[in-house]
């Protein structure tokens, strides 16, 4: 059990050292909020209450089309598990629709593992060689399990250069 004045210490937040702190609590010591807000620091600490306030309340009549359509470019032969995990994570963010652009070898894996995501198959069976049209998407994620094939790298560079959408790499 650890008490810390005003802010958590950085070591509380790392796996190697958090074990030694155990459960911790912050004790305010009356620092000026102006001084706290204007003191430069490379770190930001966000509490759960702040994150929860960012979530939109959904009406019982809301529909998936109102919450964005994302594209996840992921997977290669032997690495489809990463694509599946990425798709599940994207869906947990609250996105309305998710399309996964995957190599041909991953079609059945994706459809069975994440049936709520739509699958769009690359022309190549083992890796990503091009992303195709991405204009209809609100945001794009790229990376999980892509591998190191030169054609995939070319497709990645083309996407980064041409994408005018929010992009998560």
What are the functions of these language-model segments?
Residues 1-6:
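Conserved phosphate- and dinucleotide-binding cores of soluble alpha/beta proteins
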Residues 7-169:
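Small-residue (G/A/S/T)-rich helix-start motifs and N-terminal tracts that mark the onset
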């Amino acid at each position: 059990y650890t008490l810390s004045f005003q802010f958590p210490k950085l070591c509380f937040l790392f796996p190697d050292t958090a074990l030694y702190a155990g459960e911790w609590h912050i004790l305010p010591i009356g620092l000026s909020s102006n001084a706290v807000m204007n003191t430069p620091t490379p770190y930001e600490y966000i509490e759960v209450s702040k994150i929860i306030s960012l979530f939109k309340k959904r009406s019982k009549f809301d529909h998936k089309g109102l919450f964005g359509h994302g594209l996840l470019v992921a997977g290669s032969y032997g690495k489809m598990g990463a694509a599946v995990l990425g798709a599940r994570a994207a869906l947990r963010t609250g996105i309305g629709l998710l399309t996964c652009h995957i190599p041909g070898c991953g079609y059945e894996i994706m459809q069975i593992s994440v049936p709520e995501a739509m699958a769009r198959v690359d022309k190549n069976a083992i890796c990503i060689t091009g992303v195709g049209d991405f204009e209809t998407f609100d945001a794009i994620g790229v990376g999980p399990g892509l591998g190191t094939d030169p054609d995939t790298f070319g497709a990645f560079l083309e996407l980064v250069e041409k994408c005018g959408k929010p992009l998560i790499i």
